[in-house]
Amino acid sequence: REAAGPPPGPPPPGYPTHLQSSGFSVGDAISWSWNRFTQNAVTLVVPVLAYAVALAAVIGATAGLVVALSDRATTAYTNTSGVSSESVDITMTPAAGIVMFLGYIALFALVLYMHAGILTGCLDIADGKPVTIATFFRPRNLGLVLVTGLLIVAVTFIGGLLCVIPGLIFGFVAQFAVAFAVDRSTSPIDSVKASIETVGSNIGGSVLSWLAQLTAVLVGELLCFVGMLIGIPVAALIHVYTYRKLSGGQVVEAVRPAPPVGWPPGPQLA
């Protein structure tokens, strides 16, 4: 009789087993995310502020160059009352069109870099690893993230041409694709497939999580720019918590206050 060998080990990262019941609760996701945010507030807020400044710089520079390179024609008008006015017509030149195209590419790349960087930091927080501000500027698997993002945008655009709804549906079910690429180093196609399977395993939880993330961002918008510095990190943490729980992963639970040190007091004698 042959001796039984050791049991097979778990699949390597990027090849999750069949998704089982996650026990996901959107209330737990919000509570965990807020707890983690309060413990890492400065570390989370500073990168979001820096990325916002970078995005504004790219948008402003692109708009300024497009206007500067475009042809402008000024027409003066005088009405019957003798009041003069002017109108300026701006015609985009080929050079301005090229600058606008390059600006869109730069903006898209920066958004994906920001998304991957914030996810990298939030995933480290979920693993209980120490994070610094620099962690959020060192995204993992950036090449996979860029290709995955291009794939999602392309399919969503094609779906949008088909009465809009197919594109919206694909965008929703592919919401965890970038997280898979960052966390498990899966290929772009495998990342999208894994996201579709993850969302399909718990559509209700995915919808509630998405609504919670949207609410966090909208509340941040209502509180002006300062609120967005809180809303975006909280939404990212909710996203990571949901991704981990629904895909069969784990997160380090929120730290609870330690019990008082020492023996409890005994009964008092009269």
Regions found by a protein language model. Give the residues of each.
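Intrinsically disordered, low-complexity Pro/Gly-rich regions
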Residues: R1-S22, V252-A270
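Short, functional N-terminal and low-complexity linear motifs
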Residues: E2-A3, S84-I90, F101-Y104, G143-L144, ...
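Selective recognition of hydrophobic, aromatic-rich stretches within alpha-helical transmembrane segments
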Residues: G9-T17, T93-K129, V153-D190, V217, ...
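Interfacial aromatic "cap" segments that immediately flank transmembrane helices
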Residues: G27-A54, P130-G159, V173-E221
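Alpha-helical transmembrane segments and their immediate juxtamembrane interface regions
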Residues: T78-P94, F180-L208, L237-P264
